[in-house]
Amino acid sequence: MKNYLSFGMFALLFALTFGTVNSVQAIAGPEWLLDRPSVNNSQLVVSVAGTVEGTNQDISLKFFEIDLTSRPAHGGKTEQGLSPKSKLFATDSGAMPHKLEKADLLKAIQEQLIANVHSNDDYFEVIDFASDATITDRNGKVYFADKDGSVTLPIQPVQEFLLKGHVRVRPYKEKPVQNQAKSVDVEYTVQFTPLNPDDDFRPALKDTKLLKTLAIGDTITSQELLAQAQSILNKNHPGYTIYERDSSIVTHDNDIFRTILPMDQEFTYHVKNREQAYRINKKSGLNEEINNTDLISEKYYVLKKGEKPYDPFDRSHLKLFTIKYVDVNTNELLKSEQLLTASERNLDFRDLYDPRDKAKLLYNNLDAFGIMDYTLTGKVEDNHDDTNRIITVYMGKRPEGENASYHLAYDKDRYTEEEREVYSYLRYTGTPIPDNPNDK
């Protein structure tokens, strides 16, 4: 008799009906496969939600994928954080199934659950799978758990499996400390990100350094950390200064439940109480005490010295353009629009049928607006006043049978850059219109 994938209660059936991938909610509906790119390796898509024990509250999780063909290296973890127990088993036929351990799946879901937590009060602990958690393939075949709670999935042919449903969670509570740590090595690493768009900034490789060794309850302030960050910035990026702190997070002895420090106010971090750390002495085989560790990871926004923060609502650097498209024979206004741009180099013609031109502001045809069969005549008027630059583009009907982009100046496949440059009338202020604008 087959076992339901209970992972503890033998009540957990993994049934799989693929659905639309939602970044925060479970997958639903078979049409989701049509929108996903094809995969090269068999994958398990994990799209579950958390249900808080004893309540009706649901916790959303972003879906993630597990590559079923990755192999653990040298007894370590795979890319997905699965232990060496979750491994491939070769068979004589070449069909290589992948064994997924229950504990590994729960751990991967736990890590995803806390990945986007922004407050220490938002931590939840994954207890187990709920009874509606199911795994199937794209054909609806159900995969059941073995007696040990593991599930074995074939990886040939290449396909995607889905784990959906719920996991049971509860608010995270720290366990009482039985053997308090004696000292903690406080390590520090920092990452800098330019506040303004900045092509010159080259982030240095993150380096971890030992700040100090403290006892449980000792403190370190936000000002001390800021000074440390500024010192590293001065060394690696002397032309920049810190603008503001983005985040400060403390990882305790590799515990996934970290301490999130305030980002918008001054703070004092008190070294957290925890169990004494040990390691096995290779010679004696006995446990020996070692210093515990706190890794403080910070992120800061930085500015070039003398530069002001970019204001997305500041339009003082933008220029106003009024663009008019006029029928050269009747002077009828075909289309008009006003644009704000920071770069006059964008004031050039683009082909609506060519995505390479998407940054350019002027059209060489108006087909996309339902104004059909027009093209450039070569006649363009460029007028200025104190606040506005008015561009009038005169257009005429293109010859029957010609495509919308036949105009010599912008035919990218038939003419050289030099030939097309002649017809870039507006790219540089003062460039004259060609003498024979009808010869295009």
Curated annotation (Swiss-Prot):
Transmembrane regions listed in the UniProt entry: none
Signal peptide, first to last residue: 1-26
GO cellular component terms listed in the entry, alphabetical order: extracellular region
Disulfide bonds: none
InterPro entries listed in its UniProt record: SAK, SAK/SK_sf, SK
Pfam families xref list: Staphylokinase
Source species, domain of life: Bacteria
Keyword annotations: Plasminogen activation, Signal, Virulence
Function comment: This protein is not a protease, but it activates plasminogen by complexing with it. As a potential virulence factor, it is thought to prevent the formation of effective fibrin barriers around the site of infection, thereby contributing to the invasiveness of the cells.
Entry protein name: Streptokinase G
